[in-house]
């Protein structure tokens, strides 16, 4: 198949974030989605243990009202199913990812030298820059939004870039490792329902486990401590739920406060709205309505839509430089493995397969090494150039280069016999008589050399060593 043949791929297949997709892009998870297995086990494990306990109690002939165990079991399984459902709804949907931009935003802002404290986003060309932050108005309040260097856009208000998922997320709350997903505008209500249902389930199992112990204490007429020692399964559930409820219960209380004040976890830790008015606060009822009863905004990304693989790669590689002066896409991103499975696009638009061994190299370090080698080469050339001037202007005695360059060439021009070098190229040891014209050239070289180095000819060479040839008698007639 020709490399220039157009290939259509779905957006999720060339997505540059760290997300994992299932079911053809219908389900989107974070890079740490494997934590879902642990979370599921932590939910289902105690639920199964509680089911076993209640079932054995219902089958025990000594139980006075076994039918009461049926509704208890039903409620526990309803809470468990809801908990798993909210967990999956939180972790498997788009949290509100902001689509990446392929080119930086157009701006008319010019660099202002009078505001040195202003931060700018710029390329290597300092004349063309865009501001790091800009002001937008939200409900009559001025809010600063930042420019995202990765997504090449100004983040919407309340959005932030998640370093784990490598995406900007609307109304970013936090990245939850227990659900393996960012918590944003499109899954926050499910996240709150997940932690609140988990809290309810823990309290429910904790309470009925104690009731089982007390019922044994009453039925068998034994002490409470003896009843505890005989009911090991209930003991395990009590300890587990007691520990767990401090975590999920604390989160539920904290996020209940955030909902009532219309804050996110990110804003609560970063800003202090008690010192200034919260531009998003609509009152307690308005805030609750916004979280639970308002319509969830649709996803801004159509992950199942088709895109041209080559065009998408070119758009990601060839970031325009009209605003930044240079591309903001690094050399490592130009040869990106996540997009095309190790393919590189040349200037004509043709795509080529990159060898496996070259796919994980750090090209930025290679470029830095090349730049250092270029600088060293330039310094060596510069040193060699001055050394060449030194050899031309300060001639050591019996130097074949001197006799060939000045003596022989001069004699060839004047038709005179040099005597500075023998016909077979060996030094004869004879001094060369230099004409007035050549002596003036040599003295000019000496003056230029001493002026450039800031020292007298007799002081020595570049490295400070004494130059015994600087006052050679050969420089005299």
Swiss-Prot record:
GO BP annotations listed: root hair elongation
Membrane-spanning segments: 32-52, 68-88, 190-210, 236-256
Biased composition regions of type Basic residues, renumbered to the chain: 378-388
GO cellular component entries: plasma membrane; root hair; trans-Golgi network transport vesicle
Pfam families: DHHC
GO molecular function: protein-cysteine S-palmitoyltransferase activity
Enzyme class: transferase
Polar residues biased stretches: 467-477
Catalytic activity: L-cysteinyl-[protein] + hexadecanoyl-CoA = S-hexadecanoyl-L-cysteinyl-[protein] + CoA
Record-annotated DHHC domain positions: 146-196
Family under the similarity heading: Belongs to the DHHC palmitoyltransferase family.
The protein's name: Probable protein S-acyltransferase 4
Species, as recorded: Arabidopsis thaliana (Mouse-ear cress)
Gene: PAT04
């Amino acid at each position: 198949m020709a490399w220039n043949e157009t290939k259509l791929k779905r957006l999720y297949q060339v997505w540059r974030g760290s997300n994992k997709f299932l079911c053809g892009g219908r389900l989107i998870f974070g890079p740490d989605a494997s934590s879902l297995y642990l979370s599921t086990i932590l939910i289902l494990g105690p639920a199964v243990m509680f089911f076993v306990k209640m079932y054995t109690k219902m089958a025990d002939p000594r139980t006075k009202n076994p039918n009461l165990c049926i509704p208890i079991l039903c409620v526990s399984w309803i809470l468990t199913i809801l908990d798993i459902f909210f967990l999956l709804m939180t972790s498997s949907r788009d949290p509100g990812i902001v689509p990446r931009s392929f080119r930086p935003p157009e701006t008319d802002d010019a660099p202002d030298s009078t505001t040195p404290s202003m931060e700018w986003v710029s390329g290597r060309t300092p004349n063309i820059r865009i501001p790091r932050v800009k002001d937008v108005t939200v409900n009559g309040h001025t809010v600063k939004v930042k420019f995202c260097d990765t997504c090449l856009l100004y983040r919407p208000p309340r959005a932030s870039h998640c370093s784990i998922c490598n995406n900007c997320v609307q109304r970013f709350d936090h990245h939850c490792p227990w659900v393996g997903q960012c918590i944003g505008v499109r899954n926050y209500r499910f996240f709150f329902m997940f932690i609140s249902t988990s809290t309810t389930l823990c309290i429910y199992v904790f309470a009925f486990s104690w009731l089982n112990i007390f019922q044994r204490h009453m039925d068998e007429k034994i002490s409470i401590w003896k009843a505890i020692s005989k009911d090991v399964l209930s003991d395990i559930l009590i300890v587990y739920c007691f520990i767990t409820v401090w975590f999920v219960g604390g989160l539920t209380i904290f996020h209940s406060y955030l909902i009532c004040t219309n804050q996110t976890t990110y804003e609560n830790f970063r800003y202090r709205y008690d010192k200034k008015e919260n531009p998003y606060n609509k009152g307690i009822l308005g805030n609750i309505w916004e979280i639970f009863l308002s319509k969830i905004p649709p996803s801004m990304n159509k992950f199942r839509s088709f895109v041209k693989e080559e065009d998408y790669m070119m758009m990601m590689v060839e970031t325009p430089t009209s605003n930044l002066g240079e591309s903001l896409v690094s050399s490592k991103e130009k040869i990106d493995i996540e997009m095309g499975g190790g393919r590189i696009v040349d200037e004509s638009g043709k795509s080529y397969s990159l060898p496996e061994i070259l796919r994980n190299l750090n090209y930025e370090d290679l470029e830095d090494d090349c730049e250092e080698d270029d600088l060293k080469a330039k310094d060596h050339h510069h040193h060699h150039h001055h050394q060449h001037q030194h050899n031309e202007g300060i001639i050591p005695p019996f130097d074949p280069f001197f006799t060939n360059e000045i003596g022989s060439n001069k004699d060839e021009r004047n038709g005179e016999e040099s005597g500075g070098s023998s016909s077979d190229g060996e030094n004869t040891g004879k001094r060369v008589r230099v004409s007035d014209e050549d002596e003036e050239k040599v003295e000019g070289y000496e003056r230029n050399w001493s002026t450039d180095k800031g020292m007298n000819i007799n002081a020595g060479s570049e490295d400070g060593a004494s130059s015994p040839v600087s006052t050679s008698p050969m420089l005299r007639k």
